[in-house]
Design a protein with these regions (language model features):
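Primarily NTPase-proximal linker/entry elements flanking Walker-type ATP/GTP-binding cores
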Residues: 1-95, 99-108, 113-133, 137
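NTP-binding/hydrolysis catalytic cores, primarily Walker-type P-loop NTPases
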Residues: 3, 7, 214-259
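Conserved beta-strand/loop subsegment of P-loop NTPase cores
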Residues: 19, 94-96, 165-172, 189-231
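Short, solvent-exposed amphipathic alpha-helical segments in soluble enzyme
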Residues: 83, 112-116, 185-189, 211-216, ...
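Inter-motif core of Ras-like GTPase G domains
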Residues: 93, 136-137, 150-176
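Conserved nucleotide-binding/hydrolysis micro-motifs of P-loop NTPases
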Residues: 102-105, 144-147, 174-178, 201-205, ...
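Conserved P-loop NTPase "ATPase switch" module shared by AAA+ and STAND
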Residues: 135-147
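Conserved ATPase-coupling elements of RecA-like P-loop NTPase cores
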Residues: 147-156, 179-183, 206-209
Length: 259
């Protein structure tokens, strides 16, 4: 299918392109697209439906505690500040945050200062007996854990196992090389991850990286964050919009390397 070849030239990994071609054939149901535009529309539908299937598979019911984990320096705390600000100011939801220590101390003082500014409680210790009303958005900030530190990763898993139902978002820097991102996901794959939150999206050179990460890890990219301003650029990832951005931005470049 010519449209699949175009996506591969725009950065989709060859293995993903082959998978997409097969999926499109099954999705087609005997109706052959008449031109490249219709082929692109078909691929958009195939990828978006698959994305939503993955998201539904890992979705946590109810109102779980949202936990942000990831390597040091990926922008977890900034992303959390954006998220909690939007929930509080835009969505008018009650919010409470826990800034917890891990295998090392959590030095993100900025989170506590931002919480004070927003009049959002930021606690330093978790207490099962001190929980807010059920409609409260609960967030947990933890220190970054190096992917090459198995002891720290295991300690992280043990600490999270003692908490109530969680929605664990893995925070990664979208400007990093695709190979590094996939290695980082593998390092945290022992956790029941609910999705990936990509930061520094404004520095990412290619939107193909978002699709390659999703297809390689079988995890939805839940949120996208760009810049340092708060609340700034922080939004839920919509697959249809990301496909359009992938194609529109990719057609303006000429480099065929995957990323």
């Amino acid at each position: 299918m010519p449209a699949v070849k175009v996506l591969e030239e725009l950065g989709l990994l060859p293995s993903h392109a082959r998978w997409l071609s097969a999926q499109a054939g099954n999705f087609l149901g005997g109706t052959k697209p008449r031109n490249l535009i219709e082929e692109m529309e078909l691929l958009r539908d195939v990828l978006s439906e698959y994305w939503n299937q993955i998201a539904q598979r890992v979705e946590k019911p109810g109102n779980p505690v949202r936990v942000l984990v990831g390597p040091p320096g990926t922008g977890k705390t900034t992303a959390l500040c954006k998220w909690m600000t939007q929930e509080s100011l835009v969505n008018r939801k009650p919010v409470r945050v826990w800034r917890l220590d891990g295998d090392r101390g959590n030095t993100a003082e900025f989170l506590s200062l931002h919480g004070e500014l927003m009049q959002i409680p930021v606690d330093r210790f978790w207490d099962d007996n001190d929980q807010p009303p059920e409609d409260t958005m609960r967030f947990v900030d933890l220190p970054g854990v190096a992917p090459n530190n198995p002891d720290a990763l295991e300690a992280l898993a043990r600490g999270l196992a003692d908490m109530p139902p969680l929605e664990i978002q893995l925070v990664l820097n979208a400007s990093y090389d695709l190979g590094l991102l996939l290695r980082q996901v593998r390092a945290f794959s022992h956790l029941p991850l609910a999705g990936i939150l990509l930061t520094h999206i404004d520095e990412a050179e290619r939107w193909s990286k978002v699709w390659n990460v999703m297809l390689a890890t079988q995890l939805p990219v839940s949120f996208l964050s760009g810049g340092q301003d708060i609340p700034g650029d922080f939004h839920r990832a919509i697959p249809e919009n990301l496909f359009d951005a992938f194609v529109n931005a990719g057609l303006q470049t000429t480099s065929p390397a995957a990323g």
